[in-house]
């Protein structure tokens, strides 16, 4: 028994060392950065009314997200041109920009990420949750986005959708006596960009 005891004592230590090595090998990169391409990123919106559904688009000005894979702490900004709203109807779009968004006074719509939950797989599909602040029409509101992500090489694609209760957030409802519209706008984003993982 005295001969076997040193070997038995060494086994837990060896196991712990192997486990630590495995965890370190499997650990994700310390920092993940995603830079969006405005030309490949599409932002659409949908607003329902009593007669039909109005659909339109916005243009991304710039977008980047960086986050620490260990802590989830995030930074960056996704910036949308508020004056780029386009539904294909000039009169309606002019009213939206002037009376609802007041884009001359509030030219940008901004999402600022604060925390990311989940892990971006190196060459696969994954889903993360991005919690942050959404600023529109001079007001800032908490917003969490669920983002399915696909990575191919250093290229990344992601999509998400969420609702903006614009009337509740202080913007004017453009309804008239004879035409009532919803007080919530649905936003859909199909984003594409470049992924960089930094150790």
List where the protein language model places each region.
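Bacterial N-terminal signal peptides that target proteins for export
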Residues: 2-16
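Bacterial N-terminal signal peptides
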Residues: 14-24
């Amino acid at each position: 028994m005295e001969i076997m005891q040193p070997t038995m004592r060494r086994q837990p230590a060896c196991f712990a060392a192997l486990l630590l090595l495995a965890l370190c090998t499997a650990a994700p990169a310390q920092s993940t950065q995603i830079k969006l391409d405005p030309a490949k990123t599409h932002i659409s919106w949908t607003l329902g009314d009593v007669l039909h559904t109005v659909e339109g688009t916005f243009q991304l000005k710039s977008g980047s997200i960086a986050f620490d894979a260990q802590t989830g702490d995030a930074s960056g900004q996704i910036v949308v041109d508020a004056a780029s709203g386009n539904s294909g109807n000039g009169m309606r779009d002019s009213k939206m920009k002037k009376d609802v968004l007041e884009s001359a006074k509030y030219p940008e719509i901004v999402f600022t990420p604060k925390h990311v939950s989940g892990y971006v797989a190196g060459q696969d599909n994954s889903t993360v949750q991005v919690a942050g602040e959404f600023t529109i029409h001079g007001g800032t509101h908490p917003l969490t986005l669920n983002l399915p992500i696909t990575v191919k090489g250093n290229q990344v694609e992601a999509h998400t959708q969420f609702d903006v209760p614009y009337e509740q957030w202080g913007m004017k409802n453009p309804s008239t006596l004879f035409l009532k519209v919803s007080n919530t706008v649905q936003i859909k984003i199909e984003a594409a960009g470049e992924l960089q993982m930094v150790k």
